[in-house]
Structures are given as C-alpha cells and as structure tokens.
C-alpha cells in the first residue's frame, strides 16, 4: 500500500505501468535471437513503442505535476533533463533503418544491451525518487482537492495514449517495410486530409504486378530473398522463381558472402594457409562432440570458431536441399562447393538429383567419393555440363568418371552414325518354346526398350563399366533380343538353342578386335543392361582401343538392331525398331544441334586413384569434342596410352591448358603444360616430397 492516500498519490499508478514495461523489455531482450532478422526487428519496434510511452509519461509529468510544483517551489528544476530517452529512441531508429545483415545485428545487439542496462539502472531509481521526494512536496504545497484533481488529469492523459498501435502511427513510426511501401504509394489527391482518403487513391508494393516484383527481386541476394519469402504467400511463390536461383555458392554464403552472380574464373589457386584453415574447419567439425566438457583454452576457442563456421555451412546446405532446390533445382546453372568443410557425398548426390541442368560444377578439395554421383544414374541426365572441377577430391575413382561420362549423354551425330532404321519390321513373332539357353542365371533381366526414354531410370546400381570375371561364362554367344517382342522371363527356362528367330547371335571369337575405321563399336548401340556382355568384356581377348565397344571392362549394351552390312550377324534380324524410333537413348527425336557432351573444362588434379580405365570411360558416346581445358596433374597411375586414347577423343583440347604428370611419356609432350601440383602442399603429386 502506498504511504499516501490513494486519492492523492499521483505517482504510484503511472509508475506501476512504467515498471511493468521495464520488466517486459528486459524479458524480451533475454529471449531475442539477434541472428534472426524478424526477431531483431520485432524487438526494436517493441522497444521503440515502450520508450515512446516513457516519453509520453515524462511529458505528462512535466505538464501536470512538475510544472505546477515549480510554480510553488523554487527548488524544483531540470527534473527530466538527463533521462536519456531521446538518445535511446534515436538508437532504435538507427537500428531499424541502418542494420542490414546478421553481422551488423550482432554488433548492434551488444551496444543495445549495454545502453538498456545503463538506462534501467538510472530509470528505476528516478521513479523511486519521485515517489519518495516529490510526493511529500506535493502534499505540502497543494491541497487535498487539488491533488485529487491533478491525479485525475494524470491518469486520464495516460489512458488516452494507451493504444500503442495508434501511438506509433501518431508519432510517424514506420518499420522499414512500411517506409518502402509509403514511398511507392501514389495518390490522386496529394493533399488528402485523412489516412482513409490516401488509401483509396494509392497502390502499395503488394499490389504491383508479378513481373515488376520479379524484376525487383532480381536485385536481391539469397538472404534477402529468403526474408522476402516470409512476408506473404505471394512473395513466397515469387521468391521461389527459378531465374532468381541460377548460381549457388553455399560455402561463401555460410561465411557472409552473398554473391549470387555467374561463376568467375580464377587463374590462381588459394594459398596453402587458406586451404589449411578449411581443412581445420572440416577436421574440427568431424571430431566435434556435443557432450564433451567445455575447454576454455585458446586452442579450444579456435576450434570452436571452426566448428561454428562448419555448422553454419551445414545449415545452409540443408536449407538449400530441403527448402529451395525442390522448387528451383531445374533452373540452377552454377553450383560451387569448393573447399567445403561440411559437404558430404550424400548432400552432393541429393543436389545433383535436384539440379539436372547444371552447367558449372565445382567440388574442389571436398571429401566426396564416387557415391556422390549415384544420382547420375541414366544416360544424358546432365548433358548441359560445361565445367567440372574435381581438383583435390582424393576419393574419386574410375567409377565416378563412368557415371559422369554416362550423364554427359551421347552426341547426336555419334548416334546417327549407327542408329539407323532397318526397314519395316517383320510381323512374324517368335515363340519362346523354340529357344533354349544354357543357364538363365547368367543373364540379367532385359529392360524394355521403349520410347519412354529419359524419364525413367534405366540402370541398376552398377556403373557403365563393371568388369565381371569371365570364368563363369559358358556360352560363346551374345544374344540380341528384339526390344518390342520380349517373352516372359519365366518362359526362358524352356528356351532352346534351336530355331533361333528374331535373334542376332554373335560369336565372341578371340580374334575379335578393333580396326580403327571399321571398329565394331560404330555399329553397336543400345541401352546398357546386366547381360553377359560384362563377362565377355573382361576377357583378355579384348584389347584397349579407346572405343566404347572394345574397351576392356566396358559393359556393353543390349542391341535392338545391327546395320545390315555388319559381318557379325549370322542371321538377319526379323524384327527391328520402327522408323522414327531409332533414337532410343533419349526416347524422342532430337534436332541437329548437339545437346550432349559439351564439357569445356575438366580438372581431376590430385585425383590419384584415376586410371586409364576411367579416362577411356570419358571417350564413350562420342568423346569430349568441345573440351579445351584438361588437368590431370597428380593422376599418378594413368599411362601414356590412356592419355592418348582420351586426347584422341578431344579434338578441341588446347595444349596450353592440358596438364599431366611430368613423369608420363604422353601425347603433346612438347606443348602440354606439365604438372601443376609440383611442390604443392595440398594436392597429390609424385614429386611432393622433393
């Protein structure tokens, strides 16, 4: 209970409200996440409203209490001259208008907490002083009835301003979004007297056409786009427009660099210290134990910073994969994950699956393995790829190159050379009872070669070239089944060798080899299946020649037809593909313009597990006719023969940008640029110990 009668106690009731506001902002301050822009702005708006109410309270006291007391006592002066309210309001306004990013928010938060603590230390004693000093003076200089009248006026003034929202409008407080909206408004009558009249003749930013909003959004960085997506459903849909997300740099974004333009070509590698810092981040993140005791040492503090950076990177990647790429993945052209501390093969696999139209992929110095490319599981699934950098990816093997080559597709000109219609198909079907095979377990299920094409996954988990031991192969024949008249697989048990119709039986003699201009690979095409081709390809009888059919270990594919001039077929095919459906790779006819294997840049620097087998996998489907830059520095196990096979399939290769180990006697030895990894501290090189 107040020490003075309630009817004449002019301070206690208003001060109770002020103390309540102090408690509220202290509570909000302790719970606010200053890294979150929405929380940050909500706190500042709340503080601005609170301190405006403090200011209003001060003005009411000056006019109805202190002013009257000064008229009757000469000892009262400058009671509210140093309460810092104006300075605090100015601080909040600057925060609302000037703070743009998370880094500035965190710096501002530190200053804000210090200033609020100082204000609270002064404000609470100030109210106590008024209650204990000025209230007795009021009792001395004013009558009972005068004090009752003063209190009524003070309470009435406070209540009239109680609606905070109206108070904010009256004092022209607008948050940043409202200010922008106000600027964009146009009014028929600029001298409208009321807010209602203004709104009738104005258009806010939310009413702009989608085309205009999309143009505005194109100037925003990814962080700002994510904020805009939280404004409304309409803005959320616009922010997910693919054209706004063509270029992704999640590693840079996690470190505060929100660049999202086209990839820039850097001629210089980062220095060893920078690379070492990235490795330290990755190591600290992998070794981090959430349940470990906190170590306050300097070394621990450095590791803590590294862990924080890696965690931020992981959050950015997770957000992209689950919240952004499902909507915009088909529009993504550039993905740079170079020197990532947190990226994993699984993450890369998910991203590649969601981004089929990538043109620029940089995975430099990441800890990925072959499984990162498992999503490139069907032919031509990433045929727009022009730039691929796997420098320093030490876990990459030939299997990854096989998947990459498959994803690049097949040249249209390469297909047309040996995918020719063989006339009208014969109508006589073959029956399963006339055919027998020695063992059905040797032959995997054949895929139905229809024109569904690119929309379906046509491969199993094995790569293009999965060598299989030839020891278990008992049949000297390769069976070519008609694609449109396949028997039920259960009927295969009754098949016989006799009366083979609608099959092309090719004997795999030991003298089967390549003859450059007449190489059999030019006459064979089809979709890969797990039939006994793989077993034949493991035979020593097949010598490496760099062609898709002849490479040892290359899984050959089920054929639907062979050219009529082929000497391999003992019996002419009865059934062939209908006219107009010979482009079985893609399921539809394609234009004359090349759409596959357009790779211009390939770096495998430091990928020391790569062998000739992987290089030859890149020659499949027409080679790499547009490749200009090839870096094989640190690929220690490749040979001159393997390099020659690859170079022969890369007619556009520029010797100036062709790098390989100096110890290899390979092609263009006099004009190629040699190894780039000499005395390099973070890439594989045969001379790294020198």
UniProtKB/Swiss-Prot annotation:
CC per GO annotation: nucleus; perinuclear region of cytoplasm; SCF ubiquitin ligase complex
Observed effect of gene inactivation: FBXL5-deletion mice die during early embryogenesis. FBXL5-null embryos accumulate excess ferrous iron and are exposed to damaging levels of oxidative stress. Simultaneous inactivation of both the FBXL5 and IRP2 genes is sufficient to rescue embryonic lethality.
Entry binding sites for Fe(3+) 2: 58, 61, 80, 126, 130
SMART domains found in the cross-reference section: FBOX (SM00256), LRR_CC (SM00367)
GO terms, molecular function: iron ion binding; iron-sulfur cluster binding
PROSITE patterns per UniProt: FBOX
One Pfam family cited in the UniProt record for this chain: LRR_6
Binding site for [2Fe-2S] cluster: 661, 675, 685-686
Extent of the LRR repeats: 340-364, 365-392, 393-418, 478-507, 575-606, 607-634, 635-660
Binding, Fe(3+) 1: 15, 57, 61, 130
Protein name per Swiss-Prot or TrEMBL: F-box/LRR-repeat protein 5
Species annotation: Mus musculus
Cofactor entry: [2Fe-2S] cluster
Role: Component of some SCF (SKP1-cullin-F-box) protein ligase complex that plays a central role in iron homeostasis by promoting the ubiquitination and subsequent degradation of IREB2/IRP2. The C-terminal domain of FBXL5 contains a redox-sensitive [2Fe-2S] cluster that, upon oxidation, promotes binding to IRP2 to effect its oxygen-dependent degradation.
């Amino acid at each position: 209970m107040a020490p003075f009668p309630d009817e004449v106690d002019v301070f206690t009731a208003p001060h109770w409200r002020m103390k309540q506001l102090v408690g509220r902002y202290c509570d909000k301050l302790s719970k606010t996440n200053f890294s979150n822009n929405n929380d940050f702005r909500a706190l500042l708006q709340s503080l601005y409203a609170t301190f405006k109410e403090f200011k209003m309270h001060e003005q009411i006291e000056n006019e109805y209490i202190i002013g009257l007391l000064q008229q009757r006592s000469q000892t009262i002066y400058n009671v509210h001259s140093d309460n810092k309210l104006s300075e605090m309001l100015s601080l909040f306004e600057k925060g609302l208008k000037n703070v743009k990013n998370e880094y500035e928010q965190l710096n501002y938060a530190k200053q804000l907490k210090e200033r609020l603590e100082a204000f609270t230390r002064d404000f609470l004693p100030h109210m106590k002083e008024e209650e204990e000093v000025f209230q007795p003076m009021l009792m001395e200089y004013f009558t009972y009835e005068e004090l009752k009248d003063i209190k009524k006026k003070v309470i009435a003034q406070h209540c009239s301003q109680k609606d905070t929202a109206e108070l904010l409008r009256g004092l022209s407080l607008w948050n940043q979004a409202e200010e922008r909206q106000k600027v964009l408004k146009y009014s028929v009558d600029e001298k409208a007297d009321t807010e209602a009249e203004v709104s009738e003749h104005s258009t806010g930013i939310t009413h702009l056409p989608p085309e205009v909003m999309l143009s505005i959004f194109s100037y925003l960085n990814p962080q700002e786009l994510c904020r805009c997506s939280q404004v409304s459903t309409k803005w959320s849909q616009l922010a997910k427009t693919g054209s706004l997300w063509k270029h992704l740099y999640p590693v840079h974004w996690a470190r505060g660099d929100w660049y999202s333009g086209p990839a820039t070509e850097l001629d210089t590698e980062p220095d060893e210290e920078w690379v070492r810092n990235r490795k330290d981040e990755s190591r600290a993140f992998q070794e981090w134990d959430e349940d470990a005791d906190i170590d306050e040492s300097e070394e621990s503090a450095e590791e803590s910073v590294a862990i924080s950076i890696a965690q931020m990177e992981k959050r950015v990647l997770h957000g992209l994969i689950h919240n952004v790429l499902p909507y915009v993945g088909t529009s993504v052209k550039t993905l740079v994950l170079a020197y990532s501390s947190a990226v994993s093969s699984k993450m890369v696999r998910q991203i590649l699956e969601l981004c089929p139209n990538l043109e620029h992929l940089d995975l430099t110095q990441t800890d990925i393995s072959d499984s990162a490319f498992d999503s490139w599981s069907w032919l031509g699934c990433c045929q727009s790829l022009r730039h691929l950098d796997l420098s320093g990816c030490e876990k990459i093997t030939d299997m990854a190159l096989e998947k990459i080559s498959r994803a690049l597709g097949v040249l249209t000109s390469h297909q047309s050379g040996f995918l020719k219609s063989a006339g009208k198909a014969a109508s006589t079907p073959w029956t399963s009872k006339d055919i027998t095979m020695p063992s059905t377990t040797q032959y995997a299920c054949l895929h139905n070669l229809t024109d569904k094409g690119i929309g379906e996954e046509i491969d199993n988990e094995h790569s293009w070239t999965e060598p299989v031991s030839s020891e278990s192969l008992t049949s000297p024949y390769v069976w070519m089944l008609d694609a449109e008249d396949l028997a039920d697989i259960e009927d295969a048990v009754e098949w016989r060798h006799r009366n083979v119709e609608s099959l092309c039986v090719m004997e795999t003699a030991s003298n089967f080899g390549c003859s450059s201009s007449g190489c059999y690979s030019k006459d064979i095409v089809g979709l890969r299946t797990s039939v006994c081709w793989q077993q034949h390809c493991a035979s020593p009888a097949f010598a490496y020649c760099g062609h898709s059919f002849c490479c040892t270990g290359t899984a050959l594919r089920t054929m639907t037809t062979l050219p009529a001039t082929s000497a391999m077929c003992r019996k002419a095919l009865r059934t062939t593909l209908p006219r107009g459906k010979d482009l079985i790779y893609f399921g539809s006819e394609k234009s004359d313009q090349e759409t596959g294997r357009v790779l211009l840049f390939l770096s495998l620097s430091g990928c020391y597990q790569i062998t000739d087998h992987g290089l030859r996998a890149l020659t499949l489907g027409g080679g790499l006719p547009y490749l200009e830059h090839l870096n094989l520095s640190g690929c220690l196990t490749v040979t001159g023969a393997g390099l020659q096979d690859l170079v022969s399939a890369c007619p556009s290769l520029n010797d100036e940008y062709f790098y390989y180990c100096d110890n290899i006697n390979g092609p263009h030895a006099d004009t190629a640029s040699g190894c780039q990894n000499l005395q390099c501290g973070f890439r594989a090189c045969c001379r790294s110990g020198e």
